[in-house]
Regions:
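Sec-type signal peptide cleavage vicinity
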Residues: 2-5, 11-12, 19-269
Length: 269
């Protein structure tokens, strides 16, 4: 069999899909000591199973600051866990952020998915088998930030921090068996800096990532921004019990934060 490649770069525009404001019942929940909740939107780049919304029980880390100090100043609230329920991110009593008593406005930084390790600087690992369960969406690191506000339910507009890789397969003959696709010799660890909103790969580019199904003959993975290694980084395709087919990139390519890269492989007999 022969494999040839067609590559396409797709710049991801952040298209906000804003949820409606809190219902009257939800507003009633927010009065008094109930604290802050959040509505949310996601940049539309097809890296999630649900592209334009969060899913029930999704969890995020939330940081709060007085004014615009951000991580350069003192944190008002550190890594509070908020959970998505009924179109809102809310928290339990221990984690709920309360408005300052001095009427200061708060600005917020939020990160998906939630982790106790999330901080101004932290390390994040994408899942190595993104075909399993929620591993694909749990690999989709996202960040949101707001201007100072005294709103009881501000909106978090999330953007995707990593690179989205899509592999489309075109077979000369229908595949005789199940198809699986791996990205090989890639980095799976991200060094994140929330203060500067920068995300870069760290560690050796010697890992493999099993991609998730993306529709007929299409597969996808979320990977750290990185520069592929010519003749090393590549795509491995397995059809049924046959020996894997391997394609190595003939030139280096820089995968950038928040951009989707689509590759089409033509597989002859």
């Amino acid at each position: 069999m022969k494999i040839s490649l067609k590559q396409k770069y797709i710049f991801l525009s952040v298209i906000a899909m804003l949820f409606t404001e809190c219902s009257q019942t939800e507003e009633d929940m927010l009065n008094g000591a109930s604290g802050v909740c959040f509505t949310a939107s996601i940049g539309q780049n097809q890296t999630r199973a649900t592209e334009d919304s969060f899913e029930t029980n999704d969890e995020i880390s939330v940081f709060a600051f007085k004014g615009e100090t951000g991580f350069s100043g003192e944190e008002y609230a550190h890594n509070r866990k908020y959970t998505f329920q009924s179109q809102l991110f809310t928290a339990d009593e221990e984690n709920t952020i309360k408005q300052p008593t001095d009427d200061s406005q708060l600005s917020y930084v939020a990160v998906y998915p939630y982790s106790t390790a999330t901080d101004a600087k932290f390390s994040f690992q994408v899942k190595e088998d993104q075909s399993a369960g929620s591993n694909y969406t749990q690999s989709d690191l996202m960040m949101a930030s707001t201007y100072p506000t005294d709103a009881q339910a501000p909106t978090l507009m999330f953007s995707h921090c990593l690179s989205s890789i899509v592999v489309n397969l075109s077979f000369a003959k229908a595949p005789a068996g199940n198809v699986s696709v791996k990205m090989v010799n890639v980095s799976t660890t991200v060094s994140a800096d929330l203060a500067t909103a920068t995300f870069s790969s760290s560690g050796e580019a010697n890992q493999s990532v099993v991609t998730a199904f993306n529709g007929t003959n299409s597969y996808k993975a979320v990977l750290p921004p990185q520069t592929t290694s010519m003749g090393s980084t590549g795509i491995e395709i397995t059809v049924g019990d046959a020996a894997p087919l391997s394609y190595k990139f003939p030139a280096s390519c820089e995968w950038k934060s928040g951009i989707r890269y689509a590759y089409t492989l033509y597989i002859a007999e």
